[in-house]
């Protein structure tokens, strides 16, 4: 008997019909002789609707109350799926994140999981119940308040619960048949991938691939939890995320795919003194604003000798906060101005094969040049090349790179609904 954790996203439980379909799949898994734990997201656009409501009643909703509000979405879908399972003759019991033992930091809106104490879940499993856990939420270790986990929180909940229960696999159900060499909405002949290493999936998630979120993959790699990405709408085998690139023979390594990200912004600090310590002041200020930095470029400044310009990218949602923090410290740090651009996009090529295939960077840049796309900034790792370009050219760039590296398959990928989550 295997212990299977399944996670269903908002599009998979968007209405009553889809909830019943999900319940049937869950019961089938139970009847196959497995213990089953299910993590669900809020139905469809429920979270966005709740956010809109909050902003209608308050220009600045208190973070604690916002978390109390938003967690209602997952509790609703959790209970509805449990009801649907019971109607099929199986036994189900639903738990909120706090009831399931998901212990977090106290940062409302973006809490991190500290621990999972799954005693109540184990008891329910021992009684033969199908266990349901509301995703995206937990309880603060210090204040005991309800917290939310931020973007990708339900995926992270599923992997954390799987690790705590020592599950055999964590199945993440989306609206595509696994992981592809590119977004099928942009590249219809994107090729399905049977397996992907944790490192490759981390790079893909960090570069904008929306099927799995970065925090979820980080957690899975840390606790060696295999992730099985499948579609809620088909019985196709999906993609297994497991193992390390070190386990892949060098000659067998391939290029995994092309990822893109429309959600970044570019910040440029102009006229910074070109002496030791000033770059550190810039990045310390950004860190104090709780903004994560992605790509970084430093150039000789054109405005004055002895000065430098530093450009970095961050999440678009956090860009204004970084600019505000830096602007407040302009005189103290000693730069001329801050420039902000949120009309950018990032496109990346990922794959363990880069380690053994010379010329990848040249082909990458040539493909973009032939498509008439100008590169603003380049960043690389052992298994990734990323460039910053205009956001209006992202789709063209993805298609050009996918074709240049021969990543396409013979069949057209199917997207069943929603946004790939």
UniProtKB/Swiss-Prot annotation:
Regulation: Feedback inhibition by lysine and threonine.
Enzyme class: transferase
UniProt keyword Repeat, yes or no: yes
Keyword ATP-binding found: yes
Any single Pfam family the record assigns to this protein: ACT_9
Residues annotated to bind substrate: 25-30, 45-49, 74, 125-126, 151-154, 274-279, 292-294, 298, 360-361, 374-375, 381-382
The family this protein is said to belong to: Belongs to the aspartokinase family.
Protein name (database record): Aspartokinase
Organism encoding this protein: Mycolicibacterium smegmatis (Mycobacterium smegmatis)
